Amino acid sequence: MVIVIGIDPGVALTGFGLLREAPDGRLEALAHGVIETPKAQPLARRLQLLQQQLQALITTWQPQEAAVEEVFFATNAKTALSVGQARGVVLLTLFNAGIAIHEYTPLQVKQAIAGYGQADKRQMQTMIKALLGLVEPPRPDDAADALAVALTHLHSRRWAQLGA
């Protein structure tokens, strides 16, 4: 059995989703949600809180692999910079925990989950709900994105095993 943590990095909100793949290939959603940092705090403190809360998730769930969404911004340099800083904290925390890290672009995630690179948030949430057998679509969007990136990794993993 393998547990994968999916991460959608951000300073204000970092989405997380944990999936378990059983030896028979069944997938189980273990947990999902967001790590939220208070806007009133200085950036360094917010990044520290992100690291501490991500470390707590790792300690609780003991994932063996991680899937992190690569982020591309073309319009807002300030947002891109802060997300990049959060991504750095996420990657370092995962690396220090000895977790294998895999990265996926938003296009790869949309194609893997919805079969269409231009899928919108609603389409993605509907597919995640169906693929994981959830009662409700995952919310908020950041948590849904994190589940989607974890699911993308598990699909990619299966394809790689078939090709081996």
PLM regions and their residue ranges:
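Phosphate- and other anionic-substrate recognition elements at nucleic-acid/protein interfaces
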Residues: 1-164
